[in-house]
Swiss-Prot record:
This is Aspartyl/glutamyl-tRNA(Asn/Gln) amidotransferase subunit C. Its EC number is 6.3.5.-. Allows the formation of correctly charged Asn-tRNA(Asn) or Gln-tRNA(Gln) through the transamidation of misacylated Asp-tRNA(Asn) or Glu-tRNA(Gln) in organisms which lack either or both of asparaginyl-tRNA or glutaminyl-tRNA synthetases. The reaction takes place in the presence of glutamine and ATP through an activated phospho-Asp-tRNA(Asn) or phospho-Glu-tRNA(Gln). It comes from Syntrophotalea carbinolica (strain DSM 2380 / NBRC 103641 / GraBd1) (Pelobacter carbinolicus). It is an enzyme of class 6 (ligase). Pfam families: GatC (PF02686). InterPro entries: Asp/Glu-ADT_sf_sub_c (IPR036113), GatC (IPR003837).
Length: 95
């Protein structure tokens, strides 16, 4: 599959990117090369390969979730610029 300039312009519009002529030309070449590599992968014989989620075995490396002591509400709110009903008051960011 060959990537053309119109497809790169379309992707740029979807991503809301303003690209210069040089950037469009460069990205067209780059994206075309990337798809060429993907097409090369399609040539591999994977009939005897078991599908996996990870290339290597993965183990959960997280620690056990244990509740510990905390500093308490009063101390946490002590340096807050503003608090109400034991909660931090922050500026509204969503209408």
């Amino acid at each position: 599959m060959k990537i053309n300039r119109e497809q790169v312009e379309h992707v740029a519009r979807l991503a809301r990117l303003a690209l210069s002529e040089d950037e469009l030309a460069s990205l067209t070449d780059d994206m075309d090369a990337i798809l060429g590599y993907v097409e090369k992968l399609n040539e591999l014989d994977t009939d005897h390969i078991i599908p996996t989620a990870h290339a290597v075995p993965v183990e959960n490396a997280f620690r056990e979730d244990c509740a510990g002591s905390s500093i308490g509400t009063d101390k946490a709110l002590q340096n807050a610029p503003e608090a109400s009903d034991n909660c931090f008051v922050v500026p509204k960011v969503i209408e």
